[in-house]
Amino acid sequence: VVCRQQGQVLSEGSALHRCAVWGSPVVHSLSPVLHRAAYAALGLTDWEYARRDVDEAAFPDAFAGLDGSWRGLSLTMPLKEVGLRAARTVTQLAAATGAANTLVRDADDPSAWTAHNTDVHGIRTALELAGCPAPSSLLVLGSGATARSALAAITSPPARVVFMVRDRVRPETLAQARAAGTAVEVVPMGRWEAVRDVDAVVSTVPPSSVIGLERLDRLDHASARTPHGPAVLDVVYGTGRTPLQRAAAEHGWPVAEGTDMLLHQATEQVRLMTGLPAPLAAMSEALRDALAQHATGRRRPSQTPDPAR
């Protein structure tokens, strides 16, 4: 087997190449399902993908203990910021968002790792599949690491973001918006009538935090780029549609699925870690099978506001 990582020959022969998802908790992570399906479809018989429960306190020692067989890590909460600091090289998107959900080992220098943010790709693709390929304005519920990835998904000027939060917007999230020249508005959680003219709604908070959905139709969407209202993405997945998604569908608004974000951020991770094009069809089928097993009670995937899990 010969693999290429970021254009370079990584290895050949039968040496084992290890990747994993780290975070806390990760017991119900679907990342192993997706990555293992990719390895099988690509014929990478000497690659393995595991999960490991690692919190912020344990991360430095765990990371320092990785031997030369390790090629990549998928990072979920609470490691997206500490993982960024561990990397020697940080990509533009990871730097802009202050969050990394992917660490990839350099093929030429085993001591060097690069931090990536593939959540942005996942969000952009999920919105595109819902008919909103180039949003210039977003309503973002929450202001944490995944919210910063949503902010980076704005691709069309003039950029504007409305944050809907219970308390206040995190300073690092405000700093990212201002550094990008994005106009910022802040409204309290549930004040849908205070939101005007957004192309898409992205929720990065637990479903129980979203209130006032009986007033969702008061959101002013006269100028939305999608003809039937703003595209609505809830990054939570695993137990069917969330109350926000159901309310949006009742109003005829296009709904983006959290599983689409999960799938497409994972395809980008596979590409970065192996250097090979990700087998989208095989990964999509594996995800559908895992969710179907959950629906029949045989396993429980994670429903989480952090889609790297």
Where are these regions (language model features)?
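Glycine-rich adenosine-cofactor-binding loop
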Residues: G23, N117-V120, L127, G131-T155, ...
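Rossmann-like adenosine-cofactor binding region
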Residues: A180-A256
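Adenosine-phosphate binding glycine-rich loop
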Residues: A231, V235-R309
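Conserved S-adenosyl-L-methionine
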Residues: S156-R160, H251-W253
